[in-house]
Amino acid sequence: MARELIDCHCHLSANEFTQDIDNVLLRAKMAGVKALVAVTEGASEFEKVIQLSKTYPGFVFPCFGIHPLQESGSDLHSVKVQDLEPILPLFQRHRDNIVAVGEIGLDFTPWFANTNQERDEQIKVFIKQLEVSKELDLPVNVHSRSAAKVTIATMKELGIRQALLHNFAGKPSVAMEGVQAGFYFSFPPAVSKNEQRAKLIRQIPLEHICLETDSPALGVDKHVRNEPGNIIISCEYIAKVKGISSDVVMEVTTQNALRLFSKLKT
């Protein structure tokens, strides 16, 4: 069968892709990728993903989101409400262009968010963007490092129905709470080196799994730039862990992605 893979979480607007994005996307097409869901981490990337979607219509699909960690110079800081408020009108303005709200979520890694105040601010920003997703009737593309339980509980409390938890690394019991809520989980090529993640992949039903690269990060070799064409590594690893064919993983995860990101069908 012809390959039809969907990368549900990649960072095409990252500086690492500035010089050769055309070749990167050509290699993705040659690898059988049929659609790319391009997330953002900050407002400076919004225009980039919109332009990429216009240059590659029907192939690159943009998302808008404010990541829980924000750059300030060469450092990262835990997101604050004032990082989000000035740009909220952009979500409405581009509601017809974007396919999801993301990358949003929570990151309680101690060296970034070690105070209750920082964590509370992250939760406020997360909730506000979840509310935007409900207003726009869009799914969410979610980051949940060291915060899996709170992330899933917050989404459930707000009645979120359509969500992708990318590069999920929480406990299997927490993942199953997300499965019961109807959420999806995606895994990048880097998980092929992680036995703990294999246990998680075994437990999550294939009907709740999508593929991602998180490129340019989270490739098999952390010293080499990852790119969307490597998504087959994720596909083959999930197949190996579950003891099924990569064709089945490809078919089911693509259907899952089309269900979750309904605008990919149009």
Residue ranges and their predicted role:
Residues 1-266:
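Mid-domain alpha/beta scaffold segments of enzyme catalytic cores
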